[in-house]
C-alpha cells in the first residue's frame, strides 16, 4: 500500500483502517466507514474484502471524525499479493450446510451407532452422545413397577440423539446400560446409572418379537368363528342333473302336448317316440335328481311330474281315457 502522505509504505498493508493516517499515528480502534463512496456499516466482511481486492494495490484512506455508525466486528483486509494472504470465502456456511445434510454419524452431539443387529439373536448395541437436551429418550419399567416390568424405551424426543440414531424404537427392551445389566434395577437406579456414564451412553437393546409382523394368513384358510358359506347357492349350470331339471320345467311350460300326440299314445301305457319328442319326458338325469337321498345343497328338486289326466284337464284337452270312452260309446251307438 502507498499512503499519499509520503511516508514509507507499510508492509502490513491496510488492516481494517489501522494503517497510518495523515494527521496522526495508527489508532487501535479506527473504523472504515466508506470504501469507493459506498457505506460499509451494513456490509458483510466478504463484500468489503471483495471491494478492497477490486481496488488494486493502492488504497487511499481519509480521516474523518467519528460518526454514529454500526459497531460491527473488526474487518481485516490483506493484499492478496502478500505472502500470507487471508482469503475470505463462504467455507463456514458451506460447512454448516454439510452438517445439516450429513448422515447421523457425522452430526455433533448425535448418536454413534454400533454395527447392525444380528437377525438371529435380535440383540444390538447403540452408542449415544449427549446433546443439548440430553440423550433424547425416556425409559419405563423397572423392579419397582407392578409386575416387575422390564426396562424399555417409552418415547423418543424429536430431533434428539436417540431419534437421529435411526435404530431405536418405542418398545425396545434395554438389557445393558454402559456395560452393566439392567436386570433387577429399579427405574431410579437405571436413571442414575445413565447420569453416571457422562456424555456417552452405551445401550444393549433387544427388540421384542411381538413388534415383528406375523405370518400372513393363507388364502384358503378359513378364519376362526366364521362358518364357510357355499360359493354359489344356485345349481351348477353345467351339471347334468340340474340341466335336465331345467329342461323339463321349460318343456312343461313351453311345449304342451298336442292332440295328435295324445291320440297316438292313448292305446299304450308307454309314451311313443313321437310323444317323447313333443311332450314332457323325464330323462334319467331327472330321475337321479328326484332321489330323496340326494343331499346336494342348493338343488331345487325333487320335481313332481303331473299325470296325463291332470295335464289334460289343465290344458283343456281330452285325455286318452276320455277319448277311449267316447270311441267305445260311438261304436255301441252304431
Swiss-Prot record:
Pfam families: PDZ. The modification Phosphoserine is found at residue 272. Residues 244-260 have a biased composition (Polar residues). Keywords: Phosphoprotein. Signal peptide: none annotated. The keyword Phosphoprotein applies. Residues 1-26, 209-306 are annotated as: Disordered. The keyword Phosphoprotein applies. Gene3D superfamilies: 2.30.42.10. InterPro entries: MAGIX, PDZ, PDZ_sf. Residues 1-13, 209-224 have a biased composition (Basic and acidic residues). It comes from the Eukaryota. Residues 125-209 form the PDZ domain. This is PDZ domain-containing protein MAGIX.
